[in-house]
């Protein structure tokens, strides 16, 4: 019984002790090469889907709008709609913050 009384404060301390999360599990901004390195780390041999568009393949909403005969005022509305629809990895992890668990969604 006396032994239990001596260890009771230690047991209480261990029960209340909460380790800090490691940096790997903390949500953080990941941009550019840091984002790619994190994807390699998380996905490993599975790999991840990444096909960058060349400058010519990137859609230009202004050119597309002019081809459709729209007015320049409509271009701002279109740009806002496109910005709202973007929910890619850069928006999720660079513009915003994400965890390594969220990065797993982009693995093959």
Curated annotation (Swiss-Prot):
CDD domains: IlGF_insulin_like. It is found in: Secreted. Residues 57-85 form a propeptide. Keywords: Carbohydrate metabolism, Cleavage on pair of basic residues, Disulfide bond, Glucose metabolism, Hormone, Secreted, Signal. GO terms for molecular function: hormone activity; insulin receptor binding; receptor ligand activity; transmembrane receptor protein tyrosine kinase activator activity. Its main location: secreted. Disulfide bonds join 31-94, 43-107, 93-98. Heterodimer of a B chain and an A chain linked by two disulfide bonds. This is Insulin-1. It comes from Mus musculus (Mouse).
């Amino acid at each position: 019984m006396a032994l239990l009384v001596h260890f009771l404060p230690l047991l209480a301390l261990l029960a209340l002790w909460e380790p800090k999360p490691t940096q790997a599990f903390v949500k953080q901004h990941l941009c550019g090469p840091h984002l790619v390195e994190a994807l390699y780390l998380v996905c490993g041999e599975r790999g991840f889907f990444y096909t960058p568009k060349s400058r010519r393949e990137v859609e230009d909403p202004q050119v597309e709008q002019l081809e459709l005969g729209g007015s320049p005022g409509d271009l701002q509305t279109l740009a806002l709609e496109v910005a709202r629809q973007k929910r890619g990895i850069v928006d999720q992890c660079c513009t915003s913050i994400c965890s390594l668990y969220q990065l797993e969604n982009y693995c093959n």
